[in-house]
């Protein structure tokens, strides 16, 4: 432990030298695992070993290997398999036990990096400790090579196991940074939110966090075991390998090329995604639905126009802007009768298709998860309506109100920093999130999600609305994991 505002911290692993960032202390690129490289590739990550001397923690670590696209290019992150690091922001490493929030980034389990999310202002405003983590992505983190090769050495869902290991690191070491290991909120957006929903069903992960925030995603993009095996065999065919050792010997570029080839073969899908493995996770979606969620407070919600973001993705947009292709997806997933009922609940217009796409992929899975949790445990639900002039309240837009994401603003928003009513909304949003992290409940004006399905709608003026998607929710019924993008192949 250090004193005052010193940025040198002593942990049981060794000393770390951080820096001052936005009035708080920050430690960047802190390893929580040994590098998963060479003979450790495709193996469960091992806890980081102790070091001698003072370790520099003033620079972000590398992002995990991925195809760097779009706005991520402006950040120019280094890519490396040695990427299992986390970033920490704290008002002070002074022995005070502050609430902790651990952030899991989104990116369809294929893209993203902890370095996109700067937690200094949240730490300063809320007197909390903010942790953002990296985890293995795509082919390196979410392909069922173990069963496909019949090799028990290869664990399932390596990317999720990385997240669990990071949570263990927080439990064991965050007190040295001014954090309370007994008050940890696990939070995420998109694939990060789906990760949170999965870890709420994991016996290994449950004891490691005490509150949960899910932004746009729950139990969707998740494969069953059969699908995960089919995907893994496609990878092995493309790579021409038959053993773990051959996989470990390949250049990472070859693995990334195989990922691109598999994705071309399975368009409009997320082939490299978590699966129900019966080990870290339940064995099936049915088992996950039937299992009780942990007795912790939950804050969850979605954005009104989620699918507008994906209209920028060629291929995905072709599905979500075609009523015929959406119908084919629904028929394949749920049968002709259910497909007809769902389609009848949405106008035959571009607006109707956008609502259907948003509900299918994000809103209904998140809403139904919240309903199930709220039956037993404290739950608060939101819909984010404040949108971009061109793209509406698209997927991920709320992140710009919560986080300091200056590196992405020029590309994503084109309008410069938050100002006026948008700045006021950002302050309200952060206040609710911070209070939830601190106390397990948001602001008093936010009514709990109950039988009325009370929902806080964030907009220029926030308002409580009962069951704002009532008609569509009733049509979707018990389908608490809508097809989402994982079910679009062949549409």
Where are these regions (language model features)?
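Non-catalytic accessory segments of hydrolases
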Residues: 1-157, 181, 266, 336, ...
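Acidic/polar residues in short coil/turn loops that connect beta-strands
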Residues: 13, 162, 180, 276-277
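A structural signal for the main folded, soluble domain(s) of proteins
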Residues: 25, 61-76, 118, 124-125, ...
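Short loop/turn segments at secondary-structure transitions that flank enzyme active sites
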Residues: 33-34, 48, 57, 92, ...
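A broad, structural surface signal
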Residues: 165-168, 172-175, 193, 230-233, ...
């Amino acid at each position: 432990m250090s004193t005052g505002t010193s940025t040198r911290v002593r942990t049981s692993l060794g000393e770390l030298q951080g820096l001052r960032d936005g009035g708080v202390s920050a430690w960047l690129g802190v390893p929580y695992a040994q590098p998963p490289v060479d003979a450790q590739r495709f193996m469960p990550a091992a806890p980081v070993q102790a070091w001698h001397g003072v370790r520099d923690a003033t620079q972000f670590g590398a992002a995990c290997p991925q195809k760097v696209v779009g706005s991520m290019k402006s950040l120019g992150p280094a890519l490396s398999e040695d990427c299992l690091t986390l970033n920490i922001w704290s008002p002070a490493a002074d022995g005070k036990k502050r609430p902790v929030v651990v952030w899991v980034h989104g990116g369809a389990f294929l893209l993203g990096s902890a370095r996109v999310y700067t937690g200094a202002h949240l730490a300063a405003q809320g007197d909390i400790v903010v942790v953002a983590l990296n985890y293995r992505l795509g082919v390196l983190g979410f392909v069922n090579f173990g069963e496909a090769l019949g090799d028990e050495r290869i664990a399932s869902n390596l990317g999720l196991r990385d997240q669990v290991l990071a949570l263990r690191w927080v439990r064991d070491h965050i007190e040295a940074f001014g954090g309370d290991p007994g008050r940890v909120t696990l939070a995420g957006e998109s694939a990060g939110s789906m990760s949170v929903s999965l870890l709420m069903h994991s016996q290994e992960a449950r004891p490691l966090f005490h509150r949960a925030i899910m932004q746009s995603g729950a139990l969707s993009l998740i494969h069953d075991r059969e699908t995960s095996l089919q995907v893994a065999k496609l990878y092995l065919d493309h790579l021409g390998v038959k053993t773990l050792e051959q996989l470990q010997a390949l250049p990472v570029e070859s693995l990334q090329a195989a990922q691109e080839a598999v994705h071309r073969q399975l368009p409009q899908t997320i082939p490299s995604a978590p699966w129900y493995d019966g080990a870290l996770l339940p064995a099936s979606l049915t088992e996950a639905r039937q299992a009780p969620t942990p007795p912790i407070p939950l804050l969850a919600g979605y954005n009104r126009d989620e699918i507008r973001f994906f209209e920028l993705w060629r291929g995905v947009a072709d599905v979500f802007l075609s009523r015929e292709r959406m119908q084919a997806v629904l028929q394949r997933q749920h049968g002709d009768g259910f497909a007809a009922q769902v389609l009848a609940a949405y106008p035959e217009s571009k607006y109707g298709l956008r609502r259907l796409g948003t509900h299918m992929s994000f809103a209904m899975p998140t809403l139904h998860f919240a309903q199930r949790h709220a039956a037993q445990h404290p739950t608060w639900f939101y819909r984010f309506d404040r949108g971009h002039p061109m793209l509406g309240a698209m997927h991920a837009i709320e992140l710009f109100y919560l986080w300091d994401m200056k590196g992405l603003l020029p590309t994503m928003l084109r309008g410069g920093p938050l100002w006026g009513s948008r700045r006021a909304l950002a302050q309200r949003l952060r206040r609710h999130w911070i209070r939830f992290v601190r106390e397990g409940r948001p602001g008093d004006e936010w009514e709990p999600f109950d039988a009325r399905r009370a929902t806080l709608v964030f907009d220029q003026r926030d308002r409580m609305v009962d069951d704002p998607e009532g008609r569509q929710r009733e049509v979707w019924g018990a389908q608490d994991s809508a097809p989402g993008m994982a079910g679009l192949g062949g549409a």
